[in-house]
Amino acid sequence: MTLVIDRGEDETAVAPISQEEIQSILEAVLADEGVERTCYVSVTIATDDEIRAQNLEWRGINAPTDVISLECEYPDDPDLGDDEPCELGDIILAPAFIERQAADFSTTAADEFRIMLVHGMLHLLGYDHLDDEEAQVMEEVENGILAAIATDAPSLTVEFTRHDEDGDAV
């Protein structure tokens, strides 16, 4: 997997985990999903203002959020040649927002960032949570991956990936 990490235009946003760990987590998601094709992923570490602008542009919501995923191609796209790499897309994460959110879920900022990174990568692979059935499937996959990676907590689980049409957790 090829990973590009960008700090966005305002370089004050800093991820609470290392670039090596980000790469390792994304590779764990690909392995869990059985993806063997070479994939390109861009991860942007953004400020609240930067992610608010992206949220407005892509989702029509004028508020900061934790993670936005912008998918490009899927690994099983029949238009890709056998040896052709897949441009999965972009994951935009807002560490300051994620840190505030961590307190609501009684997790550390680093663990919440890990959760959002897995969540964003699964969106690039086609998972969604627009209804309860999709959300349950996505949560089960997230929990399986989180159980396999190192975290600050002895066990880390995901709940509440359901959102209404305004993007608010329900």
Residue ranges and their predicted role:
Residues V118, L122-G126:
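Short active-site segment of divalent metal-dependent hydrolases/proteases
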Residues M1-F113, L125-V170:
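An acidic/histidine-cluster motif and surrounding catalytic segment
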